[in-house]
Amino acid sequence: MKGCCPYLTMATHYSHFMEGAYNIRVIRYENGTFEIRQYSNPVNAIYEGETSVAPIYHTGMKRKVNLEYNPFTDEMEKLRTVEDAERSAKNSLNRTKQNIYKFSRQADWEYFITLTFDGSKVNRYDFDECMGKANNWFNNQKKRKAPDLKYLFVPEQHKDGAWHIHGVIADVGEMSFADSGRVAIGQKAYRRSDVNSEFATIYNLSGWRFGFSTATKVRDKYKVASYITKYITKDLCESTFGKKRYYRSRNIPEPIEKGFIVEPQDFDSFMTEMVDSFGCGMVYQKEVNGLYQSVTYRFYQEEREEKENE
């Protein structure tokens, strides 16, 4: 990391400030990646006063807040409804996805992995037992094989209720990978031949003794976030209520983030100043268009020495 992050103290002169609100968000990841998200409408720009109606800044709509008298507090309080519960569940799902997204950007991941559980060795229908075995195994690998190991994994449940995990790992040290003789083509595995040898080799993690394992090398780090977040579903959130929905090693820190409210006429000059402060070029861009919000994602990467191919 090159010194401090200059964008933490710059660009405040571009616009007015609203606490918690932003239409540009800048994120600095541990692996030297900078991300700029540009929103078509401000995020979190909602004001709620003492009345039951609150204006929503970016649409001009009004949101009605239902109130009821609470005899225990002698105050008018928000009435929770079925709609509130559904919204809460959706928000929980989105928060989990957002957390996994940001941590999945924090490392230069080397392998996608899938680990299953053998019913003769583990009660594969017991969430706590399966996740405990997996988490302990990763921590043991850090102690014995790869002291700098980074991992991020999420559980997934088979239709029959059995659990397995999907994840990514990096800085694998002396961990052992055995060539399975197969390659990954899309979502399927095929025996390697002269015809398909250019596809990703499927390895097995030799140290995983609780079931079956696969590992394939990451070829596009910008697809890691999409790969790992797709396993976070409504069904998973319901079946793991009150439990952890993802696991990460302690050496994956929180990224550094800052939000700005920038007036439309200042976007170009803001972006120029911001990118100049990074000192690196853009490597990836995508746009996501929604009914009420559109977001442009831009990624910039510091130059770093490539790891030697093993």
Tell what function each PLM region has.
Residues 164:
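Calcium-binding loop positions in Ca2+-binding modules
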